[in-house]
Amino acid sequence: MRASILLFTFLFIAHAALAGDGKQYGKELTVKEVTKISDILAKPEIYNGKRILVEGNIVDVCKERGCWIKIASDKDFESLVFKVDDGVITFPLDAKGKKAHGEGVLSVKTFTKEQLIESGKKHAEKEKQEFDPASIKGPKTVIQLKGEGAVID
Amino acid sequence: MIKWRKWNNILHRDIGYTITMLTLVYGISGIAVNHTADWNPNYQLQKESFSLEPVKGTATPEMKQNVMSQLNLKDEPKSVFRPDPETIQLFYQGRTYTVDIPTGKGIIEHVRPRSVLFEFNQLHLNTPKKAWTWFADAYAASLIIVAITGLFVLKGKNGITGRGAFFSIVGVVIPAVYWIWYQYL
């Protein structure tokens, strides 16, 4: 009986400590001005390597480790991946649909067809999925924000 | 008779009692998060498919209303997203509706935190940061004290000079051999 009371008290305190909105993840935000995701995606080379702040609704979260979120652009059919190093920040899976402000350094990298096939094979092997190298049609530019801090409403 | 063993055993016993709960938390969570490739240790994910009439409307707000009406959803979603011209997503707390606009076929994804394990994992992985970092440091220091004092609880043939020496060496050899194999072989 006493053990049960202790366990429930512990869980209640832990839950209360972990609950709440407007949560800070990682470092505090320092950039004041928001850059529109649509502007970044339109001319990524301008922002490559720069520290920026973006805002938008979270439309996807890394299911395995919570190590990235996808933030919707201010325009339809666009989004930006906000990627953090594994373990540094763990985003909750139920953050989908919430509004986020994320700060980090923009990374723009172009991968060759061969690099994409190699990486696709490794990913498929890890995920135990099938991979068709023919699905890779050519080089691809990956734009993501190397995230350092975020606030989720 | 020197009194260091008495104080050693008192420290081992009382710190041991104090950290029992946290050791269970870290141990259970440790097993859970070791296997993230096989499951999500924090959340239960469930997907259900459904079928609607093709979604009507030309702009996103109209399409959202049409989907809500077809699914009989009364509450406004937290947000709506169009990942591509043929898909609309409605986000509610703990569930996401993804609908293929031309066919009306869709999927509901339910996300629920796993009871108990969610809290255990958050504490183990120090998600709260701030004060919990200090608690976690104190816990780690306590574990070190319990481990060292544990070596000297017993004396005689079951102590560190007898049986204890054998098992302590086994505890050193296992990680050392594994690391050499992992790093160099």
Regions found by a protein language model. Name each.
Chain A
Residues 19-153:
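OB-fold and OB-like single-stranded nucleic-acid-recognition modules
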Residues 4-13:
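Sec-dependent N-terminal signal peptides
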